[in-house]
């Protein structure tokens, strides 16, 4: 995506056509950002020389997450008329970029998927409208779980053992690469440690 096209779609005031400059929608909200982050054990694959596998696993999560939201958006991501009738659209307009580390410099590969607040209506009258962003929020947890299931499947296909990971509070609902110890993950979790320390300094916990 060129800088010009990005500015046209995500710029202030609402999306413009990246080629003609025509205003497609008027909106104060340019879109929504999805951050799709690999489990720390997947990040460690890049550290031990298996970056290709790491990226294949991450691709599976990103693709499955976006595909789910794409289907939801195609089926009824637009609203038509005062009754806000759910309307079929041509799907998502989005840009994706992958970062390799956390702000603290730890291995923390993650995707930023920027979904534009604009959809092409497939009703008889056609045209472009602002997206029904509430629909995306309603389906975000489902999209996350589908993405995680896809990565688990891909990891097994690549020959890795996996194990459930409920996280420290028991609600994470994730999985991890088996055989990569907690001590390794903690070594490369400086950002998480900084956040925990800041929260504890306020007299609360995470």
What kind of region is each of these model predictions?
Residues 1-206:
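Intrinsically disordered, flexible peripheral segments
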């Amino acid at each position: 995506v060129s800088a010009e096209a990005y500015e046209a779609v995500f710029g202030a005031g609402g999306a413009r056509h990246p080629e003609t400059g025509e205003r497609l929608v008027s909106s104060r909200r340019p879109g929504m950002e999805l951050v799709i982050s690999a489990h720390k054990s997947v990040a460690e694959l890049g550290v031990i020389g298996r970056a290709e596998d790491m990226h294949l696993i991450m691709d599976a999560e990103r693709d499955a997450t976006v595909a789910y939201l794409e289907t939801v958006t195609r089926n009824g991501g637009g609203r038509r008329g005062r009754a806000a009738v759910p309307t079929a659209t041509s799907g998502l307009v989005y840009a994706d970029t992958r970062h390799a580390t956390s702000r603290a410099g730890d291995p923390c590969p993650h995707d930023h998927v920027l979904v534009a607040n604009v959809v092409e209506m497939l009703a008889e009258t056609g045209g472009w409208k602002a997206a029904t962003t509430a629909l995306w929020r309603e389906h975000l947890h489902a999209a996350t779980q589908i993405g995680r299931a896809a990565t688990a499947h891909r990891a097994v296909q690549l020959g890795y053992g996996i194990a459930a990971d409920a996280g420290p509070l028991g609600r994470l609902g994730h999985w991890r690469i088996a055989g990569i110890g907690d001590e390794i993950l903690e070594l490369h979790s400086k950002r998480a440690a900084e956040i925990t320390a800041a929260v504890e300094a306020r007299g609360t916990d995470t």
